């Protein structure tokens, strides 16, 4: 504990030494740095420094240092783990956007009679984190309930600096599960949350303002669903929403402003025949509206839906022939991570595309990926942490 405190205080002191008196005046002049505006105690964050400066120093810590910093002392832990601190960092542009990917883990290999190593099991999936600024890769610790891999086809969303993993199939029995897990990047820990009210697979998902929305998909009998629910991350509560006008299996969720778009999908009696329309939930009113011809009929929307410069939905698989198959895109601030293959069975490539419109008008820049992070990407989302 003492070593951790010494390390961080030494770095903070070095940083402060470079600041001029004018910086102190600047901090005092900013109303959002006033300790009186906080509901948690900010005094004595760093002995000998005003609360505002102590807060400024901790605000400048990179998110990767938060797990260790939260163990320095109780006041730091209280601050770093609070939603108030997250919103403060976001307000002054100190948050950081990363891609969280459900990705196949490296397979375990054994020697065969032909002396050619071969895999001993079907692929397991973990959560990979890609930092677009440093171009670095990392992998989250597994969920305690699933130490050998995440539920297959689980869906990801991010709210207020946390990652939410919902549903999927048990990796051993292949039975659909209702599990919900929340990962806190500050503590580097998973927490079991309240289960999804009912089993559903291949549903649309999106998040906004601390809530995660799910709609459509199919139940354990393979019947398509038109029901929708919203999960409040802070309250750990599920609330049922008004149903969509029709069933939508294998639909795709997209957040556009204050609207949750459920794109395409198909009905129970039309297995695999993807429809052209979309249904849009207006978050303010809680009402659904239909958007006819919003998507190309017969085209699977899973994980490849983007928004073009003209506001219309586009398929990221059409950006370049290199990503036409198994396409997955994650918007990351000023760019988009795009993953895909040139043809069925070929290895996936990882690219950054310019702009937030999925690279519609920009070229793809191929990313160098370490072997352990080159596995198949099933889905993903952006987390602002």
Q: Which positions does each model-derived feature cover?
A:
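Kelch-like beta-propeller repeat domains
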Residues: 2-385
């Amino acid at each position: 504990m003492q070593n951790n405190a010494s390390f961080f205080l030494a770095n903070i002191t070095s940083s402060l030494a470079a600041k001029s008196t004018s910086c102190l005046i600047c901090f005092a002049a900013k109303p959002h740095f006033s300790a009186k505006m906080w509901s948690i105690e900010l005094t004595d964050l760093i002995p000998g420094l005003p609360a505002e400066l102590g807060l400024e120093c901790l605000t400048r810590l990179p998110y990767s240092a938060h797990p260790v910093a939260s163990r320095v002392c109780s006041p730091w832990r209280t601050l770093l783990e609070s939603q108030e601190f997250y919103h403060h960092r976001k307000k002054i542009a100190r948050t950081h956007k990363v891609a969280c990917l459900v990705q196949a883990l490296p397979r375990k290999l054994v020697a065969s009679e032909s002396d050619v190593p071969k895999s001993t099991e079907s692929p397991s999936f973990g959560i990979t984190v890609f930092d677009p600024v440093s171009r670095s890769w990392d992998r989250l610790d597994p969920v305690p309930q699933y130490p050998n891999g995440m539920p297959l086809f689980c869906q990801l969303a991010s709210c207020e600096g946390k990652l939410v993993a919902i549903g999927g199939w048990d990796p051993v029995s292949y039975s659909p599960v209702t599990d919900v897990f929340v990962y806190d990047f500050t503590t580097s820990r998973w927490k079991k949350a309240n289960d999804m009210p009912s089993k559903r697979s291949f549903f649309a998902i999106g998040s906004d303002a601390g809530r995660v929305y799910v709609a459509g998909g199919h139940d354990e009998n393979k019947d398509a669903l038109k029901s929708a629910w919203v999960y409040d991350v802070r309250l750990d509560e599920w609330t049922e929403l008004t149903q969509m006008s029709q069933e939508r299996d294998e639909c795709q969720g997209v957040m556009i402003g204050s609207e949750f778009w459920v794109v395409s999908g198909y009905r129970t009696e039309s297995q695999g025949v993807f429809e052209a329309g979309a249904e849009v939930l207006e978050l303010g009113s809680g009402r659904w509206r239909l958007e006819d011809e919003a998507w190309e009929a017969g085209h699977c929307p899973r994980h490849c839906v983007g928004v073009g410069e003209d506001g219309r939905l586009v398929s990221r698989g059409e950006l370049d022939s290199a990503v036409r198959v198994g396409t997955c895109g994650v918007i990351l601030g000023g760019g988009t991570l795009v993953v895909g293959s040139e043809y069925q069975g070929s290895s996936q490539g990882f690219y950054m595309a310019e702009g937030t419109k999925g690279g519609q008008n920009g070229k793809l820049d191929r990313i160098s990926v370490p072997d352990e992070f080159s596995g198949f990407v099933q889905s993903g989302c952006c987390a602002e942490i």
